[in-house]
Regions:
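Alpha-helical "hinge/linker" immediately C-terminal to small N-terminal DNA-binding modules
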Residues: 1-18, 77
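N-terminal winged-helix
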Residues: 3, 17-48, 52-65, 211
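Flexible hinge/capping segments at coil-to-helix
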Residues: 18, 88-101, 105-127, 211
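Secondary-structure junction motif
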Residues: 35-37, 78, 125-147, 209-210, ...
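A late-sequence structural motif
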Residues: 36, 190-231
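Short beta-strand-centered segments that line the small-molecule binding cleft or hinge
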Residues: 39-43, 61-101, 105, 185-189
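Hydrophobic hinge/microswitch elements
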Residues: 59, 68-72, 78, 133-187
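Beta-alpha-beta core module
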Residues: 85-94, 99, 161-208
Length: 231
């Protein structure tokens, strides 16, 4: 009896039939772009056309609420302070890239020549952050409470480009990652004592083993290990 040859193909994350009704909604923090990671994310979906993707990129967005409500599947962003995440036990996260947290300022700012600044050095300063009650804004307020710092003024916006224009004009400073300096052409003075913050892959625990989520996480972990291994 003759048998048909067996052809083995590289499996897709999802079958074509599943892919037509399967969507992946991803929240992206600004650190994704400053660490040149968006190109890798886009490439993943280029080779997996069976997954329909939507990106949410609002600056300072609280991604945890829409994930909990089932409106978002994954967030790739920094983790906020523990006390700002209710029901944190329902989420799981994996660090992708770790970098120093800095005080960002205009390159013309005299303080840009310093080798380090403490959070207390922000006393009486103007700071640029996200919209009121956004995760970015609440994180700033929490840090000010923790260090007993009173700011002189706060500028808020919902766009990172607006934030950076304010920064370059010397209107205030931003607390952010070291990678912003090169990406946005601003100065970065490291916080002292050193504060390391990671860009994390975050999702609900119950969704962690979904094939498309697991595949994306593993691919990004591989890429980031080559870029800047997490210790």
């Amino acid at each position: 009896m003759a048998y048909a040859p067996i052809i083995i193909k590289e499996p897709k994350v999802l079958s074509e039939d599943q892919g037509r009704c399967r969507r992946l909604r991803i929240g992206l923090g600004a650190r994704v772009y400053s660490n040149r990671l968006f190109e890798e994310i886009a490439h993943f979906f280029d080779v997996h056309p069976e997954i329909e993707v939507t990106f949410v990129t609002e600056a300072g967005q609280d991604f945890f609420v829409p994930m909990r409500e089932g409106k978002l599947d994954v967030a790739i962003d920094r983790l906020p302070p523990v006390q700002l995440i209710p029901d944190r036990g329902g989420f799981v996260s994996w660090p992708l890239i770790r970098e120093r947290q800095c005080i960002l300022m205009a390159e013309s700012d005299p303080r840009s020549r310093l080798t380090g600044m403490t959070f207390q050095d922000l006393q009486g300063c103007a700071v640029i952050t996200g919209l009121e009650n956004s995760m970015e804004d609440r994180t700033l307020k929490q840090e000010c409470r923790d260090f007993g710092v009173t700011l002189n003024r706060i500028y808020r916006s919902d766009g990172i480009e607006t934030d950076m224009k304010l920064l370059r004009k010397g209107m205030g400073v931003i607390i952010g990652p070291e990678s912003f300096a090169d990406y946005y052409h601003v100065a970065a003075v490291p916080l002292v004592p050193e504060v390391m913050v990671s860009l994390d892959f975050i999702c609900l625990k119950k969704n962690a083993n979904r094939p498309e989520i697991a595949a994306l996480r593993k691919q990004l972990a591989k890429v980031c290990k080559e870029k800047a291994p997490c210790e």
